[in-house]
């Protein structure tokens, strides 16, 4: 079976190699700067989440495609990362995620003090798992909470030529991120922003924070949004590998959202589960 998988991957690599977008070509002569387009998108999503004094709580559910699990088993961690409960306090930089899957629970806490990772209630010091988790945790905070993610690490921003898809026009911005995702010193991301609504439609990113993903790039399309209090948050996603091969990787949706429960940091750091005001699942949203 392993030989079959290796042969399949080799064929895909030869047939589907794709490079990450680079600067080039004249941007539209509409007078809009990259920063102006980004600022408009940030405002369309409700502004800078770091100014929100309370908490944001999500539930998610999804599935990983079979081939990506075989190619990147440590990164996908699909035995644990199927559903999640997420607790985010952006003003403090505290992001806690409790994943569940057929193999049990994975509890991840990212804070200004660092990263903690536990499986089935036991904290791990496995460096490979921690490195992969650092990268995916950063990426999913970007997916779920939008333009605010870029404010802390955007070293440069430039405009690429616009693109059209399904009859819609999208501004494209190339951002250089320092640091990158997880342990990467640098990554790049192309933001596709709807020229009409200013919503983020897609993020195309490099993922250099883990040895087996260096040189690869993926895109994630935001297929649906919901208004939650003053914010506009994406709730349905499709992630695809774009290079060095082209395959679907992951699709998921947000199944619950609520704001401002008033939980404490102590309520989300226990690897055995969330407690206090963080304990109950996020309030369900209609599919």
Question: Where on the chain are the PLM-derived regions?
Answer:
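Short solvent-exposed loop/turn micro-motifs enriched in small/polar/acidic residues
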Residues: 79, 101, 155, 184-186, ...
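Bacterial signal peptide processing site
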Residues: 18-21
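Short structured motifs
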Residues: 24, 44, 156-161, 219-222
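N-terminal mature ectodomain segment of secretory-pathway/periplasmic proteins
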Residues: 29, 35-124, 156-158
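C-terminal motif of bacterial Sec signal peptides marking the signal peptidase cleavage site
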Residues: 13-16
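Flexible, processing/modification-adjacent segments and terminal tails
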Residues: 29-32, 36, 111-187, 207-214, ...
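Gly/Pro-enriched, hydrophobic low-complexity segments
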Residues: 166-269
């Amino acid at each position: 079976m392993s030989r079959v998988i290796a042969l399949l991957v080799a064929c895909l690599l030869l047939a589907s190699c794709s490079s990450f977008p680079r600067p080039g070509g004249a941007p539209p002569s509409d007078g809009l700067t990259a920063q102006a387009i980004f600022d408009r998108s940030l405002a369309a999503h409700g502004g800078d989440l770091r100014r929100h004094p309370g908490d944001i709580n999500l539930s998610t559910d999804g599935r990983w495609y079979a081939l990506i699990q075989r190619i990147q088993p440590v990164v996908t961690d699909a035995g644990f990362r199927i559903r999640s409960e997420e607790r985010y306090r952006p003003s403090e930089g505290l992001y806690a995620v409790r994943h569940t899957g057929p193999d049990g629970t994975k509890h991840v806490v990212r804070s200004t003090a660092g990263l903690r990772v536990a499986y089935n209630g036991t904290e791990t010091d496995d460096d490979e798992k921690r490195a992969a988790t650092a990268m995916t945790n950063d990426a999913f905070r970007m997916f779920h909470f939008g333009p605010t993610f870029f404010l802390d690490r955007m070293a440069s921003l430039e405009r690429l030529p616009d693109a059209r898809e399904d009859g819609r026009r999208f501004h494209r911005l190339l951002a250089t991120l320092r640091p990158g995702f997880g342990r990467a010193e640098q990554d790049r991301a192309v933001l596709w922003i709807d020229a009409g609504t200013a919503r983020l439609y897609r993020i195309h990113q490099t993922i250099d924070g883990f040895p087996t993903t260096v040189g690869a790039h993926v895109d994630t399309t935001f297929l649906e949004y919901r208004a939650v209090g003053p914010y506009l948050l994406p709730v349905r996603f499709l992630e695809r590998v774009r290079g060095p091969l082209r395959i679907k990787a992951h699709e998921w949706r947000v199944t619950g959202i609520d704001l401002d429960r008033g939980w404490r940091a102590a309520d989300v750091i226990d690897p055995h589960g969330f407690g206090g005001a963080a304990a109950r699942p996020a309030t369900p949203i209609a599919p």
